[in-house]
């Protein structure tokens, strides 16, 4: 499966700032059923541009999540993912499962907003989904992303996709 080897991602604007839902939780930014059509359209557009998947970005320059996946980054201080709440990000069961297991293995985990350049300089980046698994991101907008095969295996193990 191509996602197992890695994916090329295209950044697409979600059209809102990273804190757009902080003062307006009634807008239901993190409700999956309301965003399904947009997610399908984003994937279709990304694929029409030669990418395998999309990563939504905020208008203030932060990477948020994939249309059907959570974003995880490995850096010197552990694993990062995008915070939920003000960002309108859906809570990812797969990311939560991985972060719990990583913490039990002594790996630091945190939520934080991440700029495009930080992700390109990270040790690795992945899109995680309970259906599609753990997909290493090979490139974002045509820029290569460093690969960490050991961490890919660990993420897949923590998520329950490998032993």
Regions found by a protein language model. Give the residues of each.
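Helix-start/capping segments and mature chain N-termini
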Residues: 1-163
């Amino acid at each position: 499966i191509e996602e197992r080897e890695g994916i090329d991602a295209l950044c697409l604007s979600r059209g809102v700032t990273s804190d757009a839902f902080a003062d307006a939780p009634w807008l239901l930014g993190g409700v999956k059923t309301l965003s399904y059509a947009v997610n399908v359209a984003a994937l279709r557009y990304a694929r029409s541009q030669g990418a395998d998947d999309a990563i939504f970005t905020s208008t203030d320059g932060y990477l948020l999540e994939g249309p059907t996946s959570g974003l995880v980054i490995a850096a010197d201080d552990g694993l990062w993912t995008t915070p939920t709440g003000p960002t309108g990000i859906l809570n990812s069961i797969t990311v939560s499962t991985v972060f719990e297991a990583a913490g039990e293995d002594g790996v630091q985990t945190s939520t934080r907003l991440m700029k495009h350049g930080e992700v390109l300089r990270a040790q690795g980046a992945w899109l995680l989904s309970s259906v599609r698994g753990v997909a290493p991101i090979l490139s974002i907008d045509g820029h290569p992303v460093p690969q960490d095969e050991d961490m890919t295996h660990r993420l897949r193990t923590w998520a329950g996709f490998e032993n």
